[in-house]
Amino acid sequence: MDARKFSTHILDTSVGKAAANVRVTVSLLDEIQEWRSLRAAQTDADGRCLLLEPGQFPSGIYKLTFHVGAYFAERDVKTLYPAIDIIVDCSENQHYHIPLLLNPFGYSTYRGT
């Protein structure tokens, strides 16, 4: 059974709230070591986003690009990071949940559940 799912959750630690309406793109590193774009999605009101579902998610190296520049611009906040790339090795048949803790001048990520 394919248990593979890929999701994220973005929290803006500068205001203590979820980051809604942030565009996230997903790319897969292909056999010739080039990034192949798979999907673009957007976080919901709770800052959550299902990126890939079972059957859409082969093993491999993935790049998540969080397009946070527009999120901060809408709030009239300058940011050092207009986009954040997180590269993840998704080689196991598991659910990969990659949260992003964000503020205008820094970020942190980890593997969640």
Regions found by a protein language model. Give the residues of each.
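Short, acidic Ser/Thr/Gly-rich low-complexity loop/linker segments typical of extracellular
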Residues: 33-50
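A glycine-anchored, Pro-Gly-centered beta-turn/N-cap motif
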Residues: 57-62
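Feature of secretome-associated and extracellular-like proteins
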Residues: 63-113
